[in-house]
């Protein structure tokens, strides 16, 4: 029985239930805009009023920013409660909680793990003065460990087959990336090395294809599901065609259905040889050409079209599973097992060496924090007690987890070990789980969502009301996701319980604010450009960006009105009211440039284009030239850039001196053999100025090459900035502040690189090239804004 809701608290019945329910594990499925943060804060405040100190709660957030905002909200609420309360004892209690906020366990799971390790480091044999390894340092160390191991393995014949399988003539990135991915994925398991060692489990083979674990675990269930779906579709078509009175067409569908059913029976009986033979022997009959009444012809054509789609689906089953006989597949599985066995060995070796290397450096990464915490919490003392686990179970009166859909299995194990049987409070929305690439496991949420609905081990509360959006937005969203989201795609059935419901009824209902889908036709640039000004060279995505920019300007200048923050009056829309979602970050540069042309201010967060910025590509080219000046493309890029400032005519004039050497040698020869030439395109004054500029550049280049042998990369980069005044130069260009900040960031990245025990210009360049090759990037440096 939950208490009555206080009169001053604005909360829906379900929100109040989530705030006030006690004595059970709770899973709160909170849809977007449903007030989950408010529920979390109010529940914490209620715990405080019930006598629990704020530092007796563990509140796990997904980001440090969320933790900071949570603390600020609590601080504000407590200060407000102190002002309003006339009870001196209660005021003192709230004041005490304000003092406890800085030490409260409101943090990310990794920050909590850090605290556990700092307290119980001795239980896991960890040096207490360890330091954290950032992502870049981890990538560098990973590369170093792998290259050393790879070199050893390539000398051993037993690994030739596995290297050949994952590599090609151009690159061995295949096996490199596979080992990295296996390592990363294994770290989401409670026993990573055990998982890596068991890679071949599902590929064990005997004498019979049907009895292999791979077939039983993956092939058979998938085939049954796909064939059952086809049978259901054919049954539906037969119901429809029966009403049309077309017996010959119906007979064709019945024959199709018999064909599919025959294959399904063979699969259910694990007679894969017969299933294969059925595919080989039987063919689909041609669609009947019998005359039919004109009134049913259109319907029959629709059925025929659907049948063609089903035939393609059936043909794809053959291509996926029966393009070769089961006997040959068994032989292939034997080979796969052999290759996987060696791959497993390699992955375990890499795992051990990478962990050892981190241990030698006394470094931990985020994954290490989780696994070391798990070791500490499961460590038994001489009396068989989990002393760390019991300490936290006794200390925390409740364990609260925000964004529970983004927790992985290792994190879940940690949370279980610091919780009592019925003191967990989990909030999230499985529909918003987008961190699978970070190994989040939304099935954890789904398992509890289903179990708690039946009252097993806990209670489920659904917050479906959305207070952030208009009914038109929510109705459109529901219409889309009811068609596409289910347990297989999205981890939850998008039923009436999961559907979004309108919570904010204050929006005016007399305006037409229907959701829109805008279809932009491709412009035929060969025939006409009337529909799009300056259309030549446009890509499809650019057309879309232009349309969005025009629509924003139209709404700004109309002006379009929206509700104010208090939802009690309307105001004209401003640029900050618009958000743009793009399917890929590669569009960010285009959005920025096109919006700038329309005079629209835009803030693109973490545009992954740092290494594409002109000032950065110039500096990277210069570092390549310092490492090896006999590289034509980087050298010409530097000479053409603002660092030297040559134009195309000057570059061509230099090349006329020596056409068959490297460009660097041509530059040197141009200076050493200099004499004025009588050419129309370059007068004597320009030629002398060119010689002086090149001499100045070569003097600096030689100086920088000497510095590269004696200084750190960061010192070298700063020396270049000082010698060339490049920072001042870029500051004077468009978007100059951002350009200068990016150059400062390059200096910081170089300093960070070398602090990781990695040295040398060439290695730094290789690191940058590796990031670019893997389509990774460093974030563009942020500018302080108002």
Task: Please state what every model-predicted region is.
Residues 98-105, 123-191, 301-323, 334, ...:
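ATP-hydrolysis module of ASCE/P-loop NTPase motor domains
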Residues 56, 177-364, 458, 546, ...:
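Conserved ATP-driven helicase/translocase motor core recognized via long
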């Amino acid at each position: 029985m939950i208490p009555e809701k206080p009169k001053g608290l604005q909360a829906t019945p379900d929100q109040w239930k989530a705030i006030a329910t006690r004595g059970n594990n709770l899973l709160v499925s909170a849809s977007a805009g449903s007030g989950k943060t408010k529920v979390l804060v109010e529940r914490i405040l209620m715990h405080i009023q019930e006598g629990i100190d704020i530092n007796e709660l563990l509140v796990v957030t997904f980001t440090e920013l969320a933790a900071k905002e949570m603390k600020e909200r609590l601080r504000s609420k407590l200060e407000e409660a102190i002002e309003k309360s006339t009870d001196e004892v209660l005021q003192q209690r709230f004041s005490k909680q304000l003092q406890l906020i800085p030490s409260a366990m409101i943090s990310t799971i990794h920050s909590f793990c850090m605290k556990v390790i700092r307290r119980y480091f001795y239980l896991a044999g960890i040096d207490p003065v360890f330091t954290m390894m950032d992502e870049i340092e981890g990538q560098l160390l990973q590369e170093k460990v792998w290259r050393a191991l790879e070199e050893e393995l390539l000398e051993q014949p037993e690994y030739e087959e596995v290297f050949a399988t994952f590599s090609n003539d151009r690159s061995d990135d295949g096996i490199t990336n596979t080992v990295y991915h296996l390592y990363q994925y294994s770290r989401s398991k409670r026993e990573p090395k055990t998982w890596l060692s068991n890679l071949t489990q599902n590929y064990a083979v005997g004498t019979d294809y049907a009895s292999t674990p791979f077939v039983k675990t993956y092939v058979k269930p998938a085939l049954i599901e796909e064939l059952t779906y086809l049978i259901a579709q054919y049954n539906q078509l037969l119901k429809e065609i029966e009403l049309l009175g077309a017996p010959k067409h119906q007979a064709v569908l019945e024959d199709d259905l018999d064909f599919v059913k025959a294959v399904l029976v063979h699969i259910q009986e694990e007679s894969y040889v017969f299933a294969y033979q059925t595919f080989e022997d039987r063919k689909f009959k041609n669609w009947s050409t019998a005359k039919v009444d004109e009134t049913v012809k259109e319907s029959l054509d629709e059925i025929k079209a659907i049948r063609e789609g089903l035939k393609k689906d059936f043909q794809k089953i053959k291509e996926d599973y029966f393009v070769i006989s089961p006997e040959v597949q068994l032989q292939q599985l034997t080979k796969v097992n052999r290759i996987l066995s060696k791959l497993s060995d390699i992955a375990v070796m890499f795992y051990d060496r990478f962990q050892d290397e981190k241990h030698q450096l006394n470094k931990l990464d985020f994954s290490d924090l989780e696994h070391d915490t798990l070791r500490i919490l499961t460590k038994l003392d001489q009396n068989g007690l989990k002393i760390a686990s019991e300490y936290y179970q006794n200390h925390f009166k409740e364990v609260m987890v925000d964004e529970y859909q983004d927790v992985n299995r290792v994190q879940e194990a940690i949370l279980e070990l610091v919780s009592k049987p019925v003191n967990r409070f989990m909030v999230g929305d499985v529909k918003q789980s987008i961190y699978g690439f970070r190994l989040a496991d939304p099935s954890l949420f789904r398992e509890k969502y289903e179990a708690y609905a039946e009252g097993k081990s806990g209670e489920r509360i659904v917050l479906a009301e959305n207070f952030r959006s208009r009914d038109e937005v929510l109705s459109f969203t529901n219409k889309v996701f009811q068609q596409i989201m289910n347990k297989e795609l999205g981890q939850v059935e998008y039923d009436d319980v999961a559907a979004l419901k309108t919570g904010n009824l204050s929006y005016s209902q007399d305006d037409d604010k229907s959701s829109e889908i805008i279809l932009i036709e491709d412009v035929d640039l060969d025939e006409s450009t009337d529909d799009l000004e300056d259309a030549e060279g446009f890509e499809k995505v650019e057309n879309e960006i232009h349309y969005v920019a025009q629509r924003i300007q139209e709404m700004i200048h109309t002006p379009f009105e929206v509700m104010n923050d208090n939802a009690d009056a309307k105001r004209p829309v401003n640029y900050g009211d618009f958000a743009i979602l793009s399917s890929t970050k590669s569009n960010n540069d285009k959005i920025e440039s096109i919006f700038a042309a329309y005079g629209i201010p835009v803030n693109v967060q973490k545009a992954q284009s740092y290494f594409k910025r002109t000032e950065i590509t110039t500096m990277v080219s210069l570092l390549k030239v310092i490492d090896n000046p006999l590289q034509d493309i980087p050298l010409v890029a530097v000479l053409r850039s603002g660092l030297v400032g040559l134009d195309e005519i000057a570059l061509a004039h230099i090349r006329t001196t020596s056409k068959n050497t490297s460009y660097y040698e041509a530059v040197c020869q141009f200076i050493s053999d200099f004499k004025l030439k009588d050419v129309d395109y370059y007068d004597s004054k320009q030629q002398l100025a060119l010689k002086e500029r090149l001499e100045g550049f070569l003097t600096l280049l030689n100086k920088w090459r000497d510095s590269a042998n004696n200084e750190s990369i960061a010192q070298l980069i700063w020396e270049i900035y000082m010698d060339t005044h490049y920072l001042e130069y870029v500051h004077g260009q468009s978007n100059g502040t951002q350009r200068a900040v990016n150059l400062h960031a390059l200096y910081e990245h170089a300093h960070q690189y070398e602090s990781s025990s990695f040295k040398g210009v060439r290695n730094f360049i290789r690191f940058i090239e590796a990031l670019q090759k893997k389509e990774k990037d460093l974030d563009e440096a942020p500018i302080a804004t108002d």
